Amino acid sequence: MNEPRRDSGFFQELARRRVYRSAAAYAVFAWVAIQAGSIIFPEFGAPAWAMRALIIIFIVGFPPAMLLAWTLDFTAKGFTRTPESGYTVAKGIWPKLAIAGVTTAMSAGVLWWVWDDYIVQTRARPARALVKEQPVVAIQEPRYLAGQSEEEWLGDGIATLIRSELAESQHVIVISRARWHEIVSEASTEDEIAELARGIGIDYLIDGELFETPDGIVLTTRIEDLENGVEILSPRTSGANVSEIIEGVVQLSTEIKRALRIPHQERVGLFEADFAIENVEAYEAYIAGLAYLVDFEYQEAENAFNAALGIAPDYHIARFRLAQLYESTGRSELARATLDRIPPDANLSKRLQLYVEGAKAYFVAQRDPGKAIEVYSELVGLYPYEVEAGQLLAEAYWLDFQDSAAIDEFRRLSEIHPYDPTSWMALGERLLDVGELDEARVALEKFASMKPGDAFAFALLGNLALQQGNFDIAVERHKNALELKPDFVVARIGLARSQYLKGDAGAAESAWRSLLTDDSVAAAYRIDSAFDLAGVLRGRGQFDKALGVIEDSMPLIREEQLRAPLALSVQGSIYLDKGDAERAETLLTRAFQEAPAPPTRFLFALGMMEFRLGHATELDETIAALRLLSDSNKPDRNEDKAANYLAGLSALEENDLGSAASLLQAAVEEPGYQYRLYRTGLAMLSRAAGDLDAAAAIAFRAATERDRGDLRLDLEIDRARALLLHAEILAELGADGEAKKQARRFLDWWRDADPALPEPARARALLDD
């Protein structure tokens, strides 16, 4: 006879009735069901409360399940009532009440935690706001959750596809890839990324995770409303391989656009995604090229784009980016040839077609600023919030000498993208170029505040100080930039210019020459340095050295094309300074023949040669040709200024002082660009008229004055000659002491000048007197 034992306790009774095992099984089953629900519910469009309901059901069901486990046992014969033990007989109903009480208390606690920390908190959040008319959206590359993977590039590739799809719409502002990488470069966690995005005014952040499973790859995605702190979409995409994941991104992009309320008619052709699905390896190489390009690793980017084209020769997006790379590194002919390999019927979206068409007009080879303005205006009209399109339009205006239109476009970009430091940087840089230093300071300080410790910010502030005449500060700012980024070419050029104007010509020349011989520096910057150094050497009477600098740089200049006529013109003018009229005429004529329209600068250089050589008839023809180029509808009067200066010098030579006065005054006062220091002509006129006081004042101003918007180192030769003219006029006034002081200053400038030049002899004659 089996009598119930009386020596068992409550916990032993739980074990005998298999309550522990039942609780564990219940927990495992609930966990599996909840995990399955998290995958299945989104696929079937289940409402957000469905998952919460499932969790609550399992919590509430726990006490009844444990009571059943206490009461019933599952055997081979099915469910049977668990026999009583001595413990339960002795305790009566109390064990049942205990198990019910404990499980109910546990369930109530968990339920309260879920309710208070999740459901109530969720309900307490602000309701999802309506999507803004033009929301600002950033796309963060999905992260791989399980460490390294052979497909690490895929997150970047997915983000690029989504970014490209959204950028095709007029109804959303998409943060560019390069700009987004700048924003999150210092962030290490998801919270930091979201906080940085929220801090600069981004409305929605799209991010997610990638992980590999035995069946393939899974991509989870989220759209976070950063302002309201809610998640508005969390789709899930899976595929057996990379191609299937990329194909899933097509549908994902549609869901994202729907969530952002992008109108149906604005949905984009899936050109890039379609190509990537069929050419995964080429797309991987293309993504690598973009990453290298962001980091200015041009050779690696070039290799990657060429690899993409080697795999898929009709990958025209990669071809377009390769052409841009060639153009930015000074290989204009190659850039144009690469663009020409993109057929008119290439399978590109309208947006990308316009970028290609605009580049054909914008690139140096066969440049047509008017056509570029037309194409980029259409692009901006279709996509008014796209930063790259607006910046290209502004630069096209700049190339067409429409400075005001260019700056207005940069202002527009800074107004609609106030969160973007590059908009403030571009605006400040162009304002510096036109001498609007006060507004430039505001823009550059805004840029610097958004990018503290940035090398480019220091360099531009150094350029601002340089143009303000604060040379010590300029040197310091450029050195700050180089401490942060030792090879930063903008700061290297700025430091050379600052050192020169501060009076340290030796250090400046060394800096320029180091740029000229540095193959890692982009060709455009090396050419800038060549013209800077040639202008300074010419201004100090070192004509042979100046010619050598230009001659050594001609391979780069010829490859770039744009400044080849300018180089010929500079060489011809220097040979004219040296008295070699034959070579001067040959070079200046070639410069004019190769010049792009309008050839104002090169006609003027020919006119100066004709004046110096006394070729009056040819000079009159050149002046007439300049006047024919004048356009009364344009605000600048470059052609009229140049013609008036040449005609004024000719009248002065013929002693027609009345005509010379009106012509030279107009040359100085009319708005526009000057190809020489026209004010020197006025000083010569006043001297010829016997007004020596006025002549001295004008000559001094010509020797010392600099344009706030342009340092014009090419005019150093005119400043030196104006200084010598000032010294001679002072001597005629009887101010011998001051005349000798200015003569010594000139001779100090020209201490290394080429021998047998007439100017040093004139200065020494003043000292002898």
What does each of the following model-derived ranges do?
Residues 1-117, 314:
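An N-terminal, helix-rich hydrophobic module
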Residues 294, 328, 363-364, 399, ...:
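Register position in tetratricopeptide repeats
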Residues 91-92, 97-103, 107-130, 156-300, ...:
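Catalytic-center loop of serine/cysteine hydrolases
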Residues 290, 324, 359-360, 395, ...:
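Residue-level recognition of tetratricopeptide repeat
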Residues 282, 316-317, 349-352, 369, ...:
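Helix-start (N-cap) detector for alpha-helical repeat units in TPR-like alpha-solenoids
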